[in-house]
Amino acid sequence: MNLEDLKKRQEKIRNFSIIAHIDHGKSTLADRILEATETVSSREMQAQLLDSMDLERERGITIKLNAIELNYTAKDGETYIFHLIDTPGHVDFTYEVSRSLAACEGAILVVDAAQGIEAQTLANVYLALDNDLEILPVINKIDLPAADPERVRAEIEDVIGLDASEAVLASAKAGIGIEDILEQIVEKVPAPTGNVEAPLKALIFDSVYDAYRGVILQVRVMDGVVKPGDTIQLMSNGKTFDVTEVGIFTPKAIGRDFLATGDVGYIAASIKTVQDTRVGDTVTLADNPATEPLHGYKQMNPMVFAGLYPIESNKYNDLREALEKLQLNDASLQFEPETSQALGFGFRCGFLGLLHMDVIQERLEREFNIDLIMTAPSVIYKVNLTDGEAIDVSNPSEFPDPTKIDSIEEPYVKAQIMVPQEFVGAVMELAQRKRGDFVTMDYIDDNRVNVIYQIPLAEIVFDFFDKLKSSTRGYASFDYEISEYRSSKLVKMDILLNGDKVDALSFIVHKEFAYERGKLIVDKLKKIIPRQQFEVPIQAAIGQKIVARTDIKALRKNVLAKCYGGDVSRKRKLLEKQKAGKKRMKAIGSVEVPQEAFLSVLSMDEE
């Protein structure tokens, strides 16, 4: 194609993504758009087509983002090229959202006609506004009996401040309003602005590992053209690769002769390891490089850390390979080897949040068949030592000696909880119990309230979300962002079995709750750890001080069964002998800790 044709083609390109809170109908809308543009034949159509992982389908959530090219013939008779970039809606996967928004010019904001705006809708809208995207509101599910499109329209205008007078009323399930959405994309979303003649600049927004072709980069071309045979260079580390193939996704990968400005597609260049390709990096040509990289999206840092150990210790290498493979597609997963006296060899992994942690654990067990033990999640604490040094600690067993600690700071989050009015009391009580500080409360409409709290991240990591859902019958929606570090009175609690510390059961707790947490855990462990031949004390300790203790009684055999009557000294001799045996056993005996014991530290409910 010559330059004129390329420029004409660029004017017909529309890049957009769909943003929504979980369950507001985003993936269904994407399905309808694919059908309406006849991208996918009716034979291949299946629900949630873009959610290609089994896990995504089962949980009904979108985890990875997907990019697809569609052709749409508009009412003006012209054919437009749409690139739909599907994004996750869950708070843990915001980094996936920020990546996909960096590749777009417009966003369709889907809001449920019955539920209205939710916390994550807001979070994603702000991300879109930061990226200067044109936002098209769509009020979905208008065929529901509880739908109230006018109220939702007013909400969009009041809470977000978008003009919703032209918002499309749609039902993705029933296929209503799909055409209007497509026409709005043509009219309102701007065409890409880049320059075809400039040196190549392409933003990597995802990478996938393919066993045959190496790492495949998913890119949005901002300036210039790339074609097979070119030598590309990555701007962050200067490495060069030869392009073997470029193409687009129409869910399936289809090879093309070139990718030009405004295109969204993939580049294969036999790249061996994913560590070479950072998501958010800029690809340029080695012989005609761009002068400066694109300002990509922000690098996400893990917030939650946990140890992962294989139950069978010979699976350690398999676990490492599995984690490396997952890391290929998931730039935000971090891990490093660690050892534990109780659990053997494993890895300390960093995750963006709890759902992310859950999903990774499930994928390891499901796709790689590795049975895992996971230790209690913890966050990064800043520990200020008495000699003036400050260290970051994410693993309770690495905490320094209490005598050397001057103060400990922990991360706080700003939590936005949107909830119907009748549950405000329950939410406030929960937040208070989790050491939250009240910030402010706004009414969104007559019934819904947006409550904002500052809460320690460590409290949210445990089971805040489940508790929130159960105390509000599932009506609350929740979104959080890290706000600051504050100093807190935190202590490290060790659990001792038979006088030995079990490092994997240590956890960090606020001084006020130390006693009850300790008591709770020793009581729980007592129920879980099987009785031994000797008595086993379970203790919770802070430093040298024991704060709670309980004993597991010994199993005993009746050694007197064979004495029929007879002399009392004979019986005493047998009992003394048994006692000495038990004592010897206790001195050398070790206690098997079942997997449930580690999980019980996690589900620390005040039951």
From Swiss-Prot:
Give the organism, scientific name. Answer: Streptococcus gordonii (strain Challis / ATCC 35105 / BCRC 15272 / CH1 / DL1 / V288)
SUPFAM superfamilies (alphabetical): EF-G C-terminal domain-like (SSF54980), P-loop containing nucleoside triphosphate hydrolases (SSF52540), Translation proteins (SSF50447)
Residues that coordinate or bind GTP: D23, H24, G25, K26, S27, T28, N140, K141, I142, D143
What's the main place this protein lives? membrane
Q: What PANTHER family has UniProt attached to this entry?
A: TRANSLATION FACTOR GUF1 HOMOLOG, CHLOROPLASTIC, TRANSLATION FACTOR GUF1-RELATED
- Fetch the Pfam families from UniProt: EFG_C (PF00679), GTP_EFTU (PF00009), GTP_EFTU_D2 (PF03144), LepA_C (PF06421)
In Gene Ontology terms, what is a biological process of this protein? positive regulation of translation
| GO CC list | plasma membrane
Q: Where is the tr-type G domain?
A: 11-193
| EC main group | hydrolase
What is a GO molecular function of this protein?
GTPase activity
Q: Which family does it belong to?
A: Belongs to the TRAFAC class translation factor GTPase superfamily. Classic translation factor GTPase family. LepA subfamily.
**Its Enzyme Commission number?**
3.6.5.n1
Question: Which HAMAP family is this protein grouped with?
Answer: LepA
According to its UniProt entry, what is the function of this protein?
A: Required for accurate and efficient protein synthesis under certain stress conditions. May act as a fidelity factor of the translation reaction, by catalyzing a one-codon backward translocation of tRNAs on improperly translocated ribosomes. Back-translocation proceeds from a post-translocation (POST) complex to a pre-translocation (PRE) complex, thus giving elongation factor G a second chance to translocate the tRNAs correctly. Binds to ribosomes in a GTP-dependent manner.
Q: What is this protein called?
A: Elongation factor 4
Q: Where would you find this protein in the cell? A: Cell membrane
Alphabetized, the UniProt keywords read: Cell membrane, GTP-binding, Hydrolase, Membrane, Nucleotide-binding, Protein biosynthesis
Q: Per UniProt, what is the membrane topology?
A: Peripheral membrane protein
**According to its UniProt record, which reaction does this protein catalyse?**
GTP + H2O = GDP + phosphate + H(+)
